[in-house]
Amino acid sequence: MIENKPAKVLFKTIMPVLLLITLVISFDLFFPPIALSDLSYNNVMYKILTDFFDVIILIPFFVFCLSKHLFRFTTHRRCLVFLLLFLSLVFLLLILYNFSLVNVYAAFYYLIVIAFFEEITFRGYMFTVLNQHFSFNKSVVISGIVFGFSHGLYSFLLFGTSIFSVLNFIGGGIIGSYIFSFIYVKTKSLVFPIYFHALLDFCGFVLF
């Protein structure tokens, strides 16, 4: 069913996400995050605390989404359970491939701080709500634009990247949105896009 007032739907759906992103960026501007490549035993507690508060910011949003029954974490099919176990094994092997404090923390970071946060926000909430009013493709593109824009804005404000790089992030955000939304729709669970998202980021960090 197509919504008669798409602009109103977009506004009501996008604004909570922009508010959430604004809170995260504001916190990280006051307490600059430590890059994983700079992590050491001397600063690991600071890294844990700042990442912890980034996750805390998500909790009210997460509870709201659960109260509306917007998404599920279940894995009913046996083959999906085996896939989940396989992805967990890949995570473990990547950590053991080059065992270090940085890689162990990176596995946690990409799974909980990055993938869990982003998939709940952009797939569990934003894509799900949009897809109740718009087609799959429109929902993917809209959520992907916001997904990429938030990454580009974060990178620009905290790491000083070019403002034009935001366009690259938006393009990548749309591609990522297609991949993760497709997995979400096919599995009917956020578990798999979260795991796959984290695995892609973690592989990129460990191998490249």
Report residues per predicted region.
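Cytoplasmic-side transmembrane-helix entry/capping segments in multi-pass membrane proteins
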Residues: T75-L84, A106, N137-K138
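N-terminal, membrane-interfacial amphipathic/helix-forming hydrophobic leader that caps
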Residues: M1-H69, F202-F208
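Membrane-helix interfacial "entry" motifs
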Residues: K5, V9, L39-N43, K47, ...
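Transmembrane helix-loop-helix hairpins at the membrane interface
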Residues: L101-F208
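Alpha-helical transmembrane spans of integral membrane proteins, capturing the lipid-embedded, hydrophobic core
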Residues: T13-I25, D51-I59, L83-L87, V140, ...
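Juxtamembrane "helix-exit" motif on the non-cytosolic side of transmembrane helices
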Residues: F27-D38, L92-V102, G152-G160
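Membrane-interface interhelical linkers
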Residues: S67-T74, L157-I163
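Transmembrane beta-strand segments that form the barrel wall of outer-membrane beta-barrel proteins
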Residues: L89-L92, L111
